Design a protein with these regions (language model features):
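Chalcogenol-based redox active-site neighborhoods
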Residues: 1-146
Length: 146
């Protein structure tokens, strides 16, 4: 299947669309919130594995509903070396089907289902990870391509 088109903004305020990703495989990972425990573990795993993933031809882009400012702080605090999209209107999350009703402590709310999509150089969805191992996510991706 072709990856859904999107238009969003990076932590530095630059516009980014699906067309901008053509020509390189992309790990597009959706996570609920900057600076929360699971999301930080996942981001650090991808940060630590970025060089190895890049050697295999992957670029990494994270997506959450946080603001550009929140993303800049998150990147600075954890030395994140990849792009984050500020999906404040959750339109990218909705396009990829990861904006959904969740439940915590009996309270229902709308939020992001932690999911990773691998998009090939032509813009097709190659793999989807719905059971994300946050602390070892980069290994989880590498293992799927061995």
């Amino acid at each position: 299947d072709m990856a859904p088109d999107f238009k969003s903004t990076t932590q530095d305020g630059a516009a980014l669309t699906l067309a901008d990703l053509k020509g390189q495989r992309t790990i597009l990972y959706f996570y609920p919130k900057d600076n929360t425990s699971g999301c930080t573990l996942e981001a650090k795993s991808l940060r630590d594995g970025r060089a190895e993933l890049a050697r295999m031809g992957f670029r990494i882009i994270g997506v959450s509903p946080d603001s550009e400012k929140s993303h800049r702080n998150f990147c600075a605090k954890h030395d994140l070396n990849f792009t984050l999209l500020a999906d404040t209107d959750h339109s990218v999350c909705e396009a990829y089907g990861v904006w959904a009703e969740k439940s915590m402590y009996g309270r229902k709310y709308m939020g992001v289902l932690r999911t990773t999509f691998v998009i090939d150089a032509e813009g097709r969805i190659e793999k989807v990870f719905t059971k994300v191992d946050t602390a070892n996510h980069y290994r989880q991706i590498l293992d799927a391509y061995k």
